[in-house]
Each structure stands twice: as structure tokens, then as C-alpha cells.
Amino acid sequence: MANRIKKGDQVVINTGKDKGKQGEVVRVDGDRVIVSNANVIKRHTKPNPQAGVAGGVVEREASIHISNVNIVNPATGKGERVGFKVLEDGRKLRVFRSSGEALDA
């Protein structure tokens, strides 16, 4: 099944500590997404001189389940659900469920 959320989409987070934050999807891994500047965690890394890693506390974005984000509708500025519409030539098109407006051309 095709994913409703793709890399580069503007999304809003529905639940969790970052509820309400908006950001761009950096990566999609199956049913999880990584959103820029959201769900930031701290990782303690050991120094590795061979790889040029200094070590210490590193902050990075952790993944969020795809069901906890909605795509932002540019017309309304709100997060909305997305569905699919099959065109006559057989292509699938992502559309907003509220308005039926096409997401990608």
C-alpha cells in the first residue's frame, strides 16, 4: 500500500510531548517518520577517533509513528487527513479528505 506521507511533506504532530509542532518529513521508515526539530532525544556517544567522532551528548530527532502526524493543508494551515483518489489512467493521487483537494499534481 502506498504511504499517505512522503519525504518533504509539511506535517503537524497530533500527540505526545511535541503535540502541535509543525515540521518537514526528513525520512519515512515503513510506518514511522522522522520530522525535523520534533521528538528530539539525547544520545550519549563514546568517542571514536578512527571515525572522527568526538563523543559526548548528541541531540537528534527520533522517529514518530505515522498515525501520530497529519499533513498540513496549505489552504487552511491545519493538519488534515489524506486519502487516495484513483484517476482514469490508473494513477493514484493523494487528496485531502475534508476538501477533496489534490495534494500532488
From Swiss-Prot:
Record GO biological process: translation
Disulfide bonds: none
Coiled coil: none
UniProt cross-references to CDD domains, sorted A to Z: KOW_RPL26 (cd06089)
Single Gene Ontology MF annotation: rRNA binding
Domain of life: Bacteria
GO cellular component terms listed in the entry, alphabetical order: ribonucleoprotein complex; ribosome
Its biological purpose: One of two assembly initiator proteins, it binds directly to the 5'-end of the 23S rRNA, where it nucleates assembly of the 50S subunit. One of the proteins that surrounds the polypeptide exit tunnel on the outside of the subunit.
Family to which the UniProt record says this protein belongs: Belongs to the universal ribosomal protein uL24 family.
Subunit relationships: Part of the 50S ribosomal subunit.
Protein name: Large ribosomal subunit protein uL24
Gene: rplX
